């Protein structure tokens, strides 16, 4: 089929280029409770993953993506911009933030970009959703691996106090209440735990192998 140009000459109509099927990227998650060192280890891991595979990763950290936004909203709601642990935050803002992170992850996975996601995601992991990524809205065929970073509560508290982040104030002031939210993750082949009490190069190497899929059949 043809159409006429403004000069009157026939111009062939363009046909849309068919979209090629794209395999979704891989979703890697560094999870665990506060103060365990998730972000530090995730940054170290993503550098190793890129060096080993040559693949780029979209790095998505919860605090970077939503830190300033949450401070503004909580300041309006409670007068405390540093609140990240009170019932007000957990009941009214927490799920919206996590949904936004998952939306961003999905948009990058769809065209084939792999994603390194950093955040607690405790509810989602305990519900088993990261073991079935389509339940999180991820593209069909998305492969997910989880690094759960462990640290005993006393050492976690020491590190939280040491980092002196105002966003931890509510948590520290209500420590016993916060401890009730600490859970043991479910067992699944997609999840590997790492004790970060003292950095262990060999154990970290095994974790990176797991993230690359080497530990699963």
Sequence positions of predicted segments:
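Glycine-rich phosphate-binding loop used to anchor ATP phosphates in small-molecule kinases
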Residues: 89-140
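Hydrophobic anchor at the beta1->P-loop junction of P-loop NTPases
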Residues: 30
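Small-molecule kinase domains that catalyze NTP-dependent phosphoryl transfer to phosphate-bearing small molecules
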Residues: 162-207, 217
